[in-house]
Curated annotation (Swiss-Prot):
Family statement drawn from the similarity comment of this UniProt entry: Belongs to the CSM3 family.
Alphabetical GO biological process terms: DNA repair; DNA replication checkpoint signaling; meiotic cell cycle; replication fork arrest; replication fork processing
Name listed for the protein in its UniProt record: Chromosome segregation in meiosis protein 3
Primary site of residence: nucleus
Subunit structure: Component of the fork protection complex (FPC) consisting of tof1 and csm3.
Organism: Aspergillus clavatus (strain ATCC 1007 / CBS 513.65 / DSM 816 / NCTC 3887 / NRRL 1 / QM 1276 / 107)
GO CC annotation, single: replication fork protection complex
Keyword terms: Cell cycle, DNA damage, DNA repair, DNA replication inhibitor, Meiosis, Nucleus
Keyword Cell inner membrane: no
Subcellular location: Nucleus
Coiled coil: none
Function: Forms a fork protection complex (FPC) with tof1 and which is required for chromosome segregation during meiosis and DNA damage repair. FPC coordinates leading and lagging strand synthesis and moves with the replication fork. FPC stabilizes replication forks in a configuration that is recognized by replication checkpoint sensors.
Record has RNA-binding as a keyword: no
Length: 267
C-alpha cells in the first residue's frame, strides 16, 4: 500500500502551485507584442546557411564569377589601316600578284578577286566578301582615308631624279649609246634637208617676184630649219660664231618665207 500511494502523492500538486496557474495578470496586447517578428524567424536559417557555407571551418566565402561579354570586332578605320589591313595588301600585291596580260583577262580577273578575298577573310572573317567590300567602300569616303590614299598615290608615282629637278640636262650615256645617238641625229638632219630642198623646188614663183627671192638664201633657210630637229647635245657643240645671221637677216628670211607661203596659197 505504501508503494502504491507514493507515486500518486508525487503527481499531485500543492494548493499554492495550483493557485499560481490561475492567478495571472497578462493582457492580450502584451502577448502579441512579445510574438517573434518575421525577421527574427529568418535569423536561424541565415545562421544555418553560414554554418553550412564553411565559415565556421575557416574557409572563404564562395565568390560568384560573372562572365564578361567579349567585345565584338568591327571593321573600322583603325583595323583597315593596321598592318593586316591595306599596308599588307600593298606589300603582298607588289610581291605576289602577277598578271599574264592580253588573252588572259578572265584568269587575271579571277586571280585578282581571289587575292582580295583571301586578304579580306584574314582581316575580318565575320563578314562575307560582298559585305566586307561594301563596308570598306563606306569607310573610303572618310576624310582620313582619302588623305592617306592621296599619300599612297604620290608614293607610287615615278620620282624625278635630283639632277632633272635641279635643271641639269646632263645625262651620262655609254660611249656606244652616244655614237648611235649622234649617227641617228645626223641621219635625221640629212633626211630633213632633202625634204626641205624638195619642197622648195616645188614652189611656183611668178615672174613678178622672181627677183625678190635670192637662191643664195635657200641653204640658210634649210640650215635654220635643220637646227629645229637637232638634239640638245649636238646644238650645244655648235660654235657660237658659226656665221649665224643677225636680227635684220632673220627678219628678211622670215619675210621671204611668208611671201613664199602666200604665193603658194594664192595660186
Amino acid at each position: 500500500m505504501e508503494d502504491d500511494s507514493a507515486p500518486i502523492s508525487g503527481r499531485s500538486g500543492s494548493p499554492d502551485h495550483v493557485d499560481d496557474l490561475f492567478n495571472y495578470d497578462f493582457g492580450l496586447d502584451e502577448l502579441l507584442g512579445q510574438a517573434p517578428s518575421r525577421t527574427d524567424s529568418t535569423e536561424p536559417k541565415q545562421t544555418a546557411t553560414h554554418a553550412m557555407s564553411g565559415l565556421g571551418l575557416g574557409l572563404d566565402e564562395e565568390v560568384k564569377v560573372t562572365k564578361k561579354r567579349q567585345p565584338i570586332a568591327k571593321l573600322d578605320e583603325r583595323r583597315l589601316l593596321s598592318q593586316p589591313g591595306i599596308p599588307k595588301l600593298r606589300r603582298t600585291a607588289k610581291a605576289k600578284l602577277k598578271f599574264r596580260g592580253r588573252g588572259h583577262e578572265f584568269s587575271d580577273a579571277a586571280r585578282l578577286l581571289n587575292f582580295y578575298q583571301l586578304w579580306l577573310d584574314n582581316l575580318f572573317p565575320r563578314a562575307k566578301f560582298a559585305d566586307g567590300l561594301a563596308m570598306i567602300e563606306r569607310l573610303g569616303h572618310s576624310k582620313r582615308l582619302q588623305t592617306i590614299r592621296r599619300e599612297w598615290i604620290e608614293e607610287e608615282k615615278p620620282q624625278i631624279s635630283t639632277d632633272i629637278q635641279a635643271g641639269s640636262p646632263q645625262i651620262n650615256l655609254p660611249a656606244d649609246t652616244q655614237t648611235d645617238h649622234t649617227a641617228l641625229a645626223s641621219e635625221n638632219r640629212n633626211t630633213t634637208s632633202a625634204k626641205l630642198q624638195e619642197n622648195l623646188s616645188n614652189y611656183v614663183i611668178p615672174d613678178g617676184v622672181q627677183n625678190s627671192v635670192d637662191d643664195t638664201n635657200l641653204p640658210a633657210l634649210a640650215e635654220a630649219d635643220e637646227r629645229l630637229f637637232m638634239s640638245d647635245d649636238d646644238f650645244a657643240r655648235l660654235p657660237d660664231d658659226q656665221g649665224a645671221p643677225d636680227d635684220d637677216e632673220w627678219d628678211a628670211l622670215l619675210r621671204e618665207q611668208e611671201d613664199l607661203v602666200f604665193i603658194n596659197t594664192s595660186t
